[in-house]
Regions:
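N- or domain-start disorder-to-order transition segments that initiate the globular core
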Residues: 1-23
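Active/ligand-binding-proximal structured segments within catalytic/core domains
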Residues: 18-68
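Residues embedded in well-ordered beta-strands
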Residues: 13, 25-29, 85
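Conserved small/polar residues in nucleotide/adenosyl-binding loops
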Residues: 172-179
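Acidic/histidine-enriched segments that form metal/cofactor-coordinating
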Residues: 57, 64-170
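Non-catalytic surface loops within mature trypsin-like serine protease
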Residues: 10, 32, 90-92
Length: 183
C-alpha cells in the first residue's frame, strides 16, 4: 500500500498510510530533539516528553493515561536527537479519540509545577539507572568523542543539576530563533 502526504495551511504535515489491519497508529513527530537544545537546556526535550502526560487545560494526568487504555489502546512517547514523538496504538474505530487526545497533550499541556518537581526526580532516577549500564556509557562516550562540543554529543536525558533548574516559565518560553539548517 502507498501512503499519502498532505500539508495543512498551518504547516502541519500529515502522512496517511491505509492498512487492512484493525489496529491503527498515529502520532505527532515534533521536529525538536536534543540537538536543538542550548547548553543550559540539556535534557529539556526529554523532560517535556515526560511532562506532556501530566495535565492539560481540560485533563488531569490520570485521565490522559486512561483515555486510550479504556478502549484497549496504548499511549506513549520518545525523544531522540532529532525529534520528540508522541503516539498512540489503538483499534481503528478509536482514531478520533486518539487524535483528539494527542492534539490536546501536544498543544495544551499545562506543565504543573508540582508535576515538574516529581518528574525531575523520576528522570534523575532514570539517569542513575542509565549510568549503571556500561553499554550505555560506552555509547555516550563514543558520541561525545565524535561530536565533541556539539549537541549531538550530549546525553538525551540531560544532567541532574540542569533538570533541577527547569521551571514552568522555561517550558512555556518559545524556542529562540536558531539556525534552521541542521549541522
Amino acid at each position: 500500500m502507498q501512503g499519502n502526504e498532505y500539508t495543512l495551511p498551518n504547516g502541519l504535515r500529515i502522512i496517511h498510510e491505509p492498512t487492512l489491519s484493525k489496529v491503527a497508529y498515529c502520532g505527532f513527530a515534533i521536529d525538536a530533539g536534543t540537538r536543538d537544545e542550548a547548553e543550559n537546556e540539556q535534557g529539556m526535550a526529554h523532560f517535556v516528553e515526560h511532562l506532556i502526560f501530566k495535565g492539560t487545560e481540560k485533563r488531569k494526568a490520570w485521565h490522559i493515561l486512561n483515555r486510550m487504555e479504556n478502549v484497549g489502546g496504548d499511549l506513549n512517547a520518545y525523544t531522540n536527537k532529532e525529534e520528540t514523538v508522541v503516539y498512540a496504538a489503538f483499534l481503528k474505530e478509536h482514531l478520533e479519540r486518539a487524535l483528539e487526545l494527542l492534539g490536546d497533550i501536544v498543544f495544551h499541556s499545562t506543565f504543573p509545577q508540582h508535576e515538574i518537581e516529581k518528574e525531575t526526580e523520576v528522570i534523575i532516577d532514570e539517569i542513575q539507572s542509565y549510568e549503571d549500564t556500561p553499554s550505555e556509557l560506552i555509547f555516550d562516550d563514543f558520541e561525545d568523542m565524535i561530536f565533541r562540543n556539539h549537541p549531538l554529543g550530549r546525553n538525551i536525558l540531560g544532567k541532574p543539576e540542569l533538570l533541577r533548574s527547569f521551571r514552568t516559565c522555561l517550558l512555556y518560553t518559545s524556542p529562540s530563533p536558531r539556525d534552521t539548517e541542521r549541522s
